Amino acid sequence: MEKDLDYTMKFEGIPEDRMSVGDTIDFVYKALVEKGYNPINQIIGYLLSGDSSYITSHKNARAIIKKFERDEILEEVITHYLNRK
């Protein structure tokens, strides 16, 4: 069967409305790295200040992280850290 070379496949990834807090942190981290930012510093800046301009709009990361409250994100980070030990 011959493939239609004029057709472009599109991979959607994880739908934004189904992302967990952990998935969101990973997604935003990767978007920040792709844009050349220090992701740890940028995420800390956002969590401390609430200023979403610390998060890139690349890949819609800024809008995605704002779907969660900052305390939910901190809870996920701390829980993940404590469960590693």
Swiss-Prot record:
Disulphide bridges, residue numbers: none
Annotated Pfam families: IreB
Parts forming coiled coils: none
Family affiliation: Belongs to the UPF0297 family.
Protein name: UPF0297 protein CD630_12830
Source taxonomy: Bacteria, Bacillati, Bacillota, Clostridia, Peptostreptococcales
